[in-house]
UniProtKB/Swiss-Prot annotation:
Binds 1 Zn(2+) ion per subunit. The keyword Metal-binding applies. SUPFAM superfamilies: Macro domain-like. This is Protein-ADP-ribose hydrolase.
């Protein structure tokens, strides 16, 4: 069985042969981390075009190795809150072994094309594998238009521990601008649409990232308040959904502190 180092080298070679990205002419690095960065840069930039079976077999083997390098996080590993069906998880959403994780997508729905970018969309697409971008391309081709803010789409999670990914596009907030009622409602729609889709798909566990708080600039405090209020209201309106366990995933210490505070007791997100 080839090592991850060798698999990366072979994948890089095949991707560079295509000459489809700006990194196609970079020399093959001798360090593992540098190879990982170059492979990720190449696959991040690659258009949503069919891939060869040879490449996909290599990627499958590499991502299987990645998947075996950590212990997945289940609901029982998550932090309990004062609500029996709401949990907190502080860490990397890619490690969650739940029915579905929510991805903060953009309107193209094809993942992030910026090489090695730190956004959640980039991380999820990279380590779910290239089949995810192709699946999203099929959705967008059938739809025939960009994805609207506040909607939700379901795909397989491919190489991630989760079974599915729910993709939703949140609203943007320009730095220094206040959160208008329209944008607050659009963010709430992201949560409602994702919850509705999860129930429609028969899912029993769903992990939300902090939608719109990264690259899209939504203030973290207001976003956390909207997320929790929307989920609690949705649960009250859908008593039949009590079997759906909901996890709020936080990645920064600021987000964790906000969710810890707001989930201490009912209606504590004013």
């Amino acid at each position: 069985m080839p090592s991850s180092f060798d698999l990366l080298g072979e994948m890089i070679g095949l991707l560079q042969t295509e000459q489809l990205t700006s990194s196609w002419a970079c020399p093959l690095p001798n360090a593992l981390t540098k190879r990982q960065d170059l492979w990720r840069a190449l696959i991040n930039q690659r258009p949503a075009l069919p891939l060869s079976k040879d490449y996909l077999n290599l990627e499958d083997a590499y991502l299987d190795d990645w998947r075996a390098s950590f212990v997945p996080v289940s609901v029982k590993d998550c932090q309990k809150t004062n609500y029996t069906s709401l949990f907190l998880y502080h860490g990397d959403i890619r490690y969650l072994a739940v029915d579905a994780i929510v991805n903060a997508a953009n309107s193209e729905l094809l993942g992030c094309f910026i090489p090695n970018h730190g956004c959640i969309d980039n991380a999820i697409h990279t380590f779910a594998g290239s089949r995810l971008r192709l699946a999203c391309q099929a959705i967008m081709t059938e739809q025939g238009r960009k994805e609207a803010i506040g909607q939700a789409k379901l795909t397989s999670a491919y190489h991630l521990p989760a079974s599915y990914i729910i993709h939703t596009v949140g609203p943007r907030i320009t730095k220094g601008h206040h959160v208008s009622p329209i944008r607050a409602d659009l963010l709430a729609r992201c949560y409602r649409s994702s919850l509705d889709l999860a129930v429609k798909a028969g899912l029993t566990s769903l992990a939300f990232c902090s939608i719109s708080t990264g690259e899209f600039g939504f203030p973290k405090k207001e976003a956390a308040q909207i997320a929790i209020k929307t989920v609690l209201k949705w649960q009250a309106e859908h008593p039949e959904s009590k079997t759906l366990t909901i996890i709020f995933n936080t990645f920064t210490s600021e987000d964790k502190a906000l969710y810890d505070t707001y989930l201490q007791k009912e209606n504590n997100c004013e």
